[in-house]
């Protein structure tokens, strides 16, 4: 396993940091499997398979689950949190209150508390994090695949001898294209 290189996006006054892996480490987990479902909560981070996969035993179901009637399952036999971090490393990761505001008119999802989470639409356009403030292609949003990530079915494209993968955002919204 290759070491993980982290990009520090923000350091808070309480010495906590928001970090992003420079490479795509794993894949093959969809946001939610039923893309044909038109209920607004099907695009909520709080009810997503990928949230459960990322947080594993640390996953706490959303209060909204009573309304949505969704049973969230992790489609893999392991979670990212338990596989990527040792017990010591995991104890250093604190839970964060996660804002799940929407974009492009979709219904916003409820706030969650998570140790591992995807960036939001606003995060991916935040110039303080080193991104450009638009939806155009931006080299700072490119993420190269690890060998393991590539083996997990991440959708990718090749430039030269490098494979770059696409990554999810947690913000509910309509697709661009």
Stretches found by the model and what they are:
Residues 1-177:
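Collagenous Gly-X-Y triple-helix signature in extracellular proteins
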């Amino acid at each position: 396993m290759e070491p993980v290189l982290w990009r520090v996006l923000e350091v808070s006054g309480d010495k906590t940091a928001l970090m992003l892996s420079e490479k795509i480490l794993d894949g093959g987990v969809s946001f939610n499997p039923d893309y044909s479902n038109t209920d607004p909560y099907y695009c909520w981070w709080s009810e997503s398979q990928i949230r459960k996969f990322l947080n594993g035993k640390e996953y706490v179901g959303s209060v909204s689950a009573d309304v949505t009637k969704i049973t969230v399952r992790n489609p893999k036999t392991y979670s990212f949190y338990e596989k990527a971090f040792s017990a010591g490393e995991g104890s250093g990761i604190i839970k964060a209150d996660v804002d799940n505001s929407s974009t492009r008119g979709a219904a916003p999802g409820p706030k969650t508390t998570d140790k591992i989470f995807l960036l939001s639409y606003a995060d991916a356009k935040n110039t303080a994090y080193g991104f450009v403030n638009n939806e155009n292609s931006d080299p700072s949003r490119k993420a190269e695949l690890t060998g393991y990530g590539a083996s997990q079915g991440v959708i990718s494209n090749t430039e030269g001898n490098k494979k770059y993968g696409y990554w999810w955002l947690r913000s509910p919204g309509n697709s661009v294209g």
